[in-house]
């Protein structure tokens, strides 16, 4: 049987402190360390050293240091680690093309060059496995939906897909006569939950670059980027529900959500590298990335089912009857929207010693409170110019709460290369990326926005800092070169199945899920084949 509460009791309930739901959008703003094996092997700390194709997408001035044209292609496997999944079991190793590009070097003066480049890179690899399980104490997913409604927090644009599914399948809002029960709110507590998530896909970055130098002292570069998003996420979530005594398990409720996001984005990057001392190889680099202006579409199919019967009590006769709530309900959603990612600013230094040792250090900063979810307005046709136009506006409530959930992130990259012989090189690198999420942030399902209204899941993870270590080898003979790199990356986080709810009147109505420690661990092997001419 369900817990039944009158509206009068719930009228005085108050939701906990508000926070923002930008967790889905934030995935699109993350960037991975990827590129040529030389670049990855040195931890990506080449924004001042330059002379590598991968710097097209980081510091556009980098290709300006090249004195020979070159082409390169990079590929290799990536392994994601995670607990074994029983429902969404699949491959943990993927193999693909990570980089392909080239730079054409043209001499325009005695000491000046004008170079043109193109580079394809997987700037973001979404592949990830996540598994979490925990016990509940007077808590459940359907309970949080009930508390949300009867606390007066349920509005037109925050009545989510998840709320709708639980409403029809579990809450018993449809009586024997097919009418909506408005006098009572009903819910089940759960003994615990288990969840499995599988994320797949990537963001392809197509970068077009022009770079050059002035008297071999100052190097300038400009890159135009086109990004193509392919993201797929499958979530399985199950709860073991309890009867009214909170002692006996009566059955399970299962949610299966399949979500896909696709679209394109544009960005611009500017960079400069300078040698402040004429006879020294010491270099200083600086660069800036505009936001990526995305237009995206997300579609999802969400299914909720239960494996037990629900019985109601007739208020007139006191007899129980089998409720006519469906045991299963499916919901399809689709949403087009725009997303602007934060600006990126970077500084770098690099130095070489006797053409044997190369050292690089890079610092980047990006303020994720500037992540901007935008609502698309209606298209219109301008008959004067003969063109279609599309306007959008910032989701004001989403934007306000983004500042409460996200924060500025600092990235530090260090790398070195040693030429053991003129043909053979050894490389190593390290990255530290500070957290983008505040530890106090949570996915607020009470915000009146499209993001809440079309939410098909409620879970979130506050990811902490990222640490990467890299190693690499290089071999060159004549104009041909080949490189290999290994990278290990780890990001720990706190997983929550849904937001916290606290009732100021009756603590038994609280919904307080505990954090579950999760970790995103990745290993990658990368190989590059290239030719200079």
Where are these regions (language model features)?
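Bacterial Sec-dependent N-terminal signal peptides
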Residues: 1-23, 529, 533
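Transmembrane beta-strand segments of Gram-negative outer membrane beta-barrel proteins
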Residues: 21-46, 63-81
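Outer-membrane beta-barrel porins/channels
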Residues: 20-34, 39-40, 98, 105-533
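A common structural microfeature
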Residues: 39, 53-55, 68-74, 97-99, ...
């Amino acid at each position: 049987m369900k817990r039944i509460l009158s509206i009068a009791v719930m009228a005085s309930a108050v939701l906990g402190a508000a926070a923002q739901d930008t967790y889905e959008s934030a995935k699109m703003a993350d960037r991975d360390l990827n590129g040529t094996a030389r670049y990855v092997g040195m931890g990506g700390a080449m924004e001042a050293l330059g002379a590598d194709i991968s710097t097209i997408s980081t510091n556009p001035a980098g290709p300006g240091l090249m004195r020979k044209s070159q082409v390169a292609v990079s590929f290799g496997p990536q392994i994601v680690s995670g607990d074994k999944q029983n429902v969404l079991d699949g491959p943990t190793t993927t193999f693909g093309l990570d980089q392909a590009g080239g730079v054409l070097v043209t001499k325009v003066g005695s000491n000046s060059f004008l170079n043109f480049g193109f580079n394809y890179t997987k700037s973001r690899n979404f592949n990830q496995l996540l598994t979490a399980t925990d016990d509940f104490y007077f808590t459940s997913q359907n309970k949080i939906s009930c508390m949300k409604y009867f606390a007066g927090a349920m509005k037109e644009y925050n009545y989510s897909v998840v709320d709708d599914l639980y409403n029809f399948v579990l809450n018993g809002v449809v009586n024997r006569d097919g009418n909506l029960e408005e006098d009572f709110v009903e819910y089940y507590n759960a003994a615990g939950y288990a969840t499995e998530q599988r994320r797949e896909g990537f963001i392809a970055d197509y970068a077009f670059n022009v770079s050059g130098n002035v008297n071999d002292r100052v190097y300038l570069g400009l890159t135009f980027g086109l990004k193509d998003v392919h993201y797929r996420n499958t979530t399985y979530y199950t709860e073991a529900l309890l009867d009214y005594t909170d002692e006996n398990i009566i059955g399970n409720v299962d949610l299966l959500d399949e979500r896909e996001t696709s679209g394109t984005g544009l960005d611009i990057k500017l960079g400069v590298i300078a040698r402040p001392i004429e006879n020294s190889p010491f270099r200083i680099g600086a660069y800036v990335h505009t936001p990526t202006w995305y237009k995206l579409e997300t579609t999802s199919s969400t299914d909720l089912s239960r494996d037990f019967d629900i019985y109601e009590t007739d208020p007139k006769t006191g007899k129980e009857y089998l409720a006519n709530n469906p045991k299963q309900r499916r919901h399809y959603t689709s949403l087009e929207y725009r997303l602007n990612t934060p600006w990126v600013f970077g500084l770098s230094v690099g130095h070489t010693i006797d053409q044997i040792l190369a050292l690089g250090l890079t610092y980047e900063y990006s303020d994720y409170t500037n992540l901007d979810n935008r609502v698309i307005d209606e298209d219109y046709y301008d008959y004067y110019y003969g063109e279609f136009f599309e306007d959008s506006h910032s989701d004001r409530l989403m934007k306000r709460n983004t500042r409460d959930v996200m924060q500025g992130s600092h990235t530090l990259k260090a790398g070195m290369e040693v030429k053991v012989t003129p043909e053979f090189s050894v490389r190593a690198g390290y990255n530290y990326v500070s957290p983008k999420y505040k530890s106090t942030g949570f996915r607020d399902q009470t915000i009146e926005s499209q993001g809440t209204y079309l939410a098909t899941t409620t879970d979130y993870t506050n990811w902490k800092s990222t640490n990467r270590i890299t190693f690499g080898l290089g071999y060159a003979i004549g104009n041909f070169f080949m490189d290999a790199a290994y990278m290990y990356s780890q990001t720990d986080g706190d997983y929550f199945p849904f937001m916290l709810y606290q009732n100021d009147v009756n603590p038994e109505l609280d919904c307080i899920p505990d954090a579950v420690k999760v970790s995103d661990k990745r290993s990658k092997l990368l190989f590059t084949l290239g030719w200079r001419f």
